[in-house]
Amino acid sequence: MPRTIIEKLWDSHVVHERPGAPTLLFIDLHLVHEVTSPQAFQGLRERGLKVRRPDLTIATADHSIPTTDRSLPIVDEIAAKQLAQLETNCKDFGIRCLGVHSSQQGIVHVIGPELGLTQPGMTVVCGDSHTATHGAFGALAFGIGTSEVEQVLASQCLLQRKSKTFQVKVDGALKAGVSAKDIILALIARIGIGGGTGSVFEYTGSAIRALSVEERMTVCNMSIEGGARAGLIAPDDATFEYLAGRPHAPKGAAWDAAIPRWKQLPTDDGATYDRSVSIDADTLEPMITYGTNPGMGVSINAALPDPSQVSDPMARDSITKALAYMGLEGGKPLVGHPIDVVFIGSCTNSRISDLRTAAGLLKGRKVSPKVRVMVVPGSQEVKRQAIAEGLPEIFRAAGCDYREPGCSMCIAMNGDQLAPGEYSVSTSNRNFEGRQGKGGRTFLASPLTAAASAITGVVTDVRTLL
């Protein structure tokens, strides 16, 4: 019987199943960070348990790590305690830790792929919502809670209920100024933040195949914002080329054996999905969010929804409240709205290709004196590559604050945050109330839109600067 890649990945990792109960799955890679792991490690201590497979577990410091000078003491006591505890826990349980001063430190969803830890056919979990990023390699990757982190540490297995299959087919070609971030923002605006509930997305189509592997990571990263458990893309030659030679990728005969196996993963001809949706890439425009969840998105020049024209009372109330929090008026476009901060970074858009894109637009230009611009590479490796290409000099010459790797303003628990009432154009993935700082107001967009808005000081259609 023909199967989707989602079904193949599930079937190949079943340890035990019985009717009406969750299935026990084997986990190939467990990624750990400092925020959701302390209670899990403490649970192991209290129960006298060891980590079952430390060789399949790796930790990094990312959420609460400062993006300022690493030679200085960490001022935030909670952050300092979390980061120190991570290193202690990893030492006690024999887990490799890419800590504050590691040359491989970075955002967990950046370092996994760049080190070659993430590979096709794997199950990957992490105590973080955006673990779906790793699905760009043809892996079944999803976020888990702290109690589940403890379960995986103790057993290398996890109880899960099987998700439905959801095909997101994107055909056509993206126009200049339109990017992978716009694909996923357009999808979420269309289906809503609950549209994928109970499902795993498989992204297919010519527009997806045309994306680089790093762009595919951006798309998969925000699957959770569309309500999905995970999102993935079948591996192809681009995937294999990306992985070849990376530190933890197979080598020699193991590599030669892996390729034919990985080529069996794509969805079979004739396989069916529980649900499908199609997007025409030819018609997509730069996207931006206006409200307080990622589903509140519009094309850059479109008018914002007018609550008085919305018939559904719940939707009308939600839009009314969002516009009030954001200080916006329905029926008018966002283009031209003043901003205070631009953030280029996060596990969605902090890879070297993202920095290249932003630097390409900023080169020879200056950012608005009214705007504070933060550029935060996703890892030490991205930082090194950016230096080799001269990107920090471009950002600094333009007037940007170029910082050390970490989650930074995406989550505002590390000193990088908005002041109450400030507006940001952000390349991150969530725009909830207070997400980037108490009272802060976030517009989610692509690196191109963010860089363009940094130059003008207002929300800007990047196509006017190309």
UniProtKB/Swiss-Prot annotation:
EC number: 4.2.1.33
Cofactor note: Binds 1 [4Fe-4S] cluster per subunit.
Statement: the UniProt record of this protein carries the keyword Heme: no
Pfam families with a match to the protein in the record: Aconitase
InterPro entries for the chain: 3-IsopropMal_deHydase_lsu, Acnase/IPM_dHydase_lsu_aba_1/3, Acoase/IPM_deHydtase_lsu_aba, Aconitase_4Fe-4S_BS, Aconitase_4Fe-4S_dom, IPM_dehydratase_rel_enz, IPMI_cat
The protein's required cofactors: [4Fe-4S] cluster
SUPFAM superfamilies listed in its UniProt record: Aconitase iron-sulfur domain
Keyword Metal-binding included in the entry's annotation: yes
Gene Ontology terms: biological process: L-leucine biosynthetic process
Residues that bind [4Fe-4S] cluster: 347, 407, 410
Pathway involvement of the protein, from the record: Amino-acid biosynthesis; L-leucine biosynthesis; L-leucine from 3-methyl-2-oxobutanoate: step 2/4
GO MF annotations in UniProt: 3-isopropylmalate dehydratase activity; 4 iron, 4 sulfur cluster binding; metal ion binding
Keywords associated with the record: 4Fe-4S, Amino-acid biosynthesis, Branched-chain amino acid biosynthesis, Iron, Iron-sulfur, Leucine biosynthesis, Lyase, Metal-binding
Reaction catalyzed: (2R,3S)-3-isopropylmalate = (2S)-2-isopropylmalate
Family membership: Belongs to the aconitase/IPM isomerase family. LeuC type 1 subfamily.
PANTHER family: 3-ISOPROPYLMALATE DEHYDRATASE, HOMOACONITASE, MITOCHONDRIAL-RELATED
HAMAP family xref list: LeuC_type1
Function: Catalyzes the isomerization between 2-isopropylmalate and 3-isopropylmalate, via the formation of 2-isopropylmaleate.
NCBIfam families, alphabetized: leuC (TIGR00170), PRK05478.1 (NF004016), PRK12466.1 (NF009116)
Known partners and oligomeric status: Heterodimer of LeuC and LeuD.
Protein known as: 3-isopropylmalate dehydratase large subunit
